Amino acid sequence: MCRKEPFLLPTALCILAALVLHQGPVEALGGSRLCKTGFLEDVYHASVYRSVHEGQPLLNVKFTDCGADRRIHYETSNPTDFRIDGDGIVCASRTFDISPEQAEFLVYAQDEDTRELWHVTVKITLRPRHVQDLHQGFHKVREIKFSTQRKHNGLQRQKRDWVIPPINVPENARGTFPQELVGIRSDRDKSLSLRYSVTGPGADQPPLGVFIINPISGQLSVTKPLDREQIATFHLRAHAVDVNGNQVENPIDIVINVIDMNDNRPEFLHQIWNGTIPEGSKPGTYVMTVTAIDGDDPKQPNGMLRYKILSQTPASSSPNMFTINNETGDIITLAAGLDREKVQRYTLIIQATDMEGNPTYGLSNTATAVIAVTDVNDNPPEFTAMTFYGEVPENRVDVVVANLTVTDKDQPHTPAWNAVYRIVGGDGTGRFAIKTDANSNDGLVTVVKPIDYETKSTYILTVVAENQVELIRGIQYKPESTATVSVTIIDVNENPYFTPNPKLIRQEEGLFAGKLLTTFSAQDPDRYMQQTIRYSKLSDPANWLKIDPVNGFITTTAVLDRESIYVKNNMYNATFLATDSGIPPMSGTGTLQIYLLDINDNAPYVYPQEVEICDRPDPNAINITALDADINPNAGPFIFELPYSPMDIKKNWTVTRLSGDHAQLSLKIGSLDYGIYNIPIQITDSGNPAMSNTSYLRVKVCSCEHGYCSTTAPIIGTGLGTGAIIAILLCIIILLTLVLMFVVWMKRRDKERQAKQLLIDPEDDVRDNILKYDEEGGGEEDQDYDLSQLQQPDTVEPDTIKPVGIRRMDERPIHAEPQYPIRSAAPHPGDIGDFINEGLKAADNDPTAPPYDSLLVFDYEGSGSTAGSLSSLNSSSSGGEQDYDYLNDWGPRFKKLADMYGGSDD
């Protein structure tokens, strides 16, 4: 059913009564005609006020199924604004002002079984609200007069200005504009022609044109509806001047107050308010404050708000779990029984209404308050089982043995839900620990110390679980839960172990091979397994030892030497392996440490073994040191002596002991020749028995400068003799002569080759692509050229201009061709050299030279020869009639013919 407001009950009853009276005749006629399933009216009408509230009934639509007992479902076309219940009563779905577009909608009725559908139109007529006169702020048009000026005793005295009361104008006024407010007049308008004007905000200042004044009559008017929320008061000033613009009256101030109307709906600062309340809170506990604001005047009822709770979801544990202060908006608890495990969140619909909460004239708005019930620790954790079981192999650590599960009704992942586990019994040695899984809140029983199966094979642990925070007072449950964990240890094949490990023995060096050192045996921790152990060598750097694979006897295979490089600080380390016969086999390692005791088995020697001394030493002494691989007492102090043989050793040298390890070798004579001397020195250690050794000290005698050896003298002594220098010079001269002769021979060979090429027999000079294979520099691809280029060499494009000295001798010159004079006579046969040179020069300057330096072809005329038939040539008998001067134009190759048959008198 729609929620009926008390103030609308008479209206609803009237509407229902009218509908009943209106439908009476129809029902009376039901027996006289066939019944039709559907709505009883084609159109339903309702008359309501514009502002409606949520749940307010508007009208009742009637539907008949003609006694078929149909299951009818109703629905409106605008469910956001209107809803209909099963009895056909149409109610407002929310609080709002009905607009003309919303005043008409459809109501649907559908058979839930057959899905048959009917509909009807609903039209709502909006009734005006009967309120006090909205225009009570308008006073009857009155008149405001300017104060007059009087004269007293010949002086003009101004009358005190009147105090003009404010003019009240309601906002949002309706009607035609401009609307007259007040008339302004001066007493002097009877004698003068005056002009009236107003100034100030709303007149000649922004907002412009809100107020205007008739300049002749002085009537002040407002031009449009006012809005108090924008400007609550206007301050204007009225002026009166004559036609010349001279002020005739003092300006008067006019105050226009905009009267507030209830035209603003309350607005909540937030549409959704969130708050929290701990579960189990007592009645009267503060939750939160909701706030709404109203744009109307807060000093008037239009802006005075009142709050109330329209609904609470869910309604358990109490339908009125919360209440609200209607003036402040404070929400507090009204009833007890807040339990987060039952209801985690409450949703309240809060309504704010102006007009001090008057449901008839006030405007309302709603917001949602979401109140979350926060958790407190009112539920302890409880184990899901009384006993948990687990197993773990022996000697394993950081292994999860068992997973303990608990349940807690408090909010997950909070201190009231997080579990803390403790072991309170069965683990006296502290081999187990329990960690909490942050996600699942389970307890993970973990092994933190190795467990030996042979020592203990079963553990019974007693564990408890509790929350991170204490339970609140008044809870009847125990704060903790107890369970038992049974852990079984699994036996595994363990590694054999040597004892002791490492094993240290002391042994004098020099022990021969095959001697028994010690027994190094291992034990098997698996007492309940019948297994054998075998031994092997894992590490023996000097290869001095061997171990018996059955009993672990260690014997030597070489002489033990303390001075070996494998011995560090008198200690020699060897590693051995013990392996059992299990499946799979397990092994363990053991280290044998042999501390070698020193014996006197190393003779001392001198250090350094080579020194330098000046030929005239000053001081004439050398410091030497004795070294011994043995250690005390088999080393120093040492005895230094010079042998008696050879005799010159003691004659020239003497040795003096400075300390137990140091001595000084001195020169007895004043100087020595340059050279190298080997001085024998006999050194004896302090061992028992003592060991002696003769060491040779290499002494280099050299020339000294400022006490240090110099290399000048040896260099001078190694100079070359005169004969060697002369021999070197002769060799150099001979080499230069050979090079010069080779160069001269090469030049002569080049000249002979060039002369031979110019003196080729004319019979052999065919040049028909003759290819030479007996010379370097080219093959067929270099000399097999196009004959057309030889027939017409003038068509060949000249190459890029080359500097002098770079152009080939057979290239065509790019400058003008020289004019050759006609020879008067053939050269003398003896002048062959000049003939060759002239021919060479002419060939070099021949403009028709081929592009390659090779033999040319002269007997190939080809097609289209310009020579014509040979029959056209005249015989020698007609030489007087022939002109052979054109032979001079054919180049040097026809120069001989030109000389023989030319027109010269010679």
Curated annotation (Swiss-Prot):
Extracellular-facing ranges: 161-724
Binding site for Ca(2+) 1: E171, D227, E229, D263
Residues of the propeptide: 29-160
Residues that coordinate or bind Ca(2+) 3: N262, N264, D294, N302, D354
Keywords, sorted A to Z: Calcium, Cell adhesion, Cell junction, Cell membrane, Cleavage on pair of basic residues, Glycoprotein, Membrane, Metal-binding, Repeat, Signal, Transmembrane, Transmembrane helix
All copies of domain Cadherin, residue ranges: 161-268, 269-383, 384-498, 499-604, 605-714
Comment, domains: Three calcium ions are usually bound at the interface of each cadherin domain and rigidify the connections, imparting a strong curvature to the full-length ectodomain. Calcium-binding sites are occupied sequentially in the order of site 3, then site 2 and site 1.
Quaternary structure note: Homodimer (via extracellular region). Can also form heterodimers with other cadherins (via extracellular region). Dimerization occurs in trans, i.e. with a cadherin chain from another cell.
Designated name of the protein: Cadherin-2A
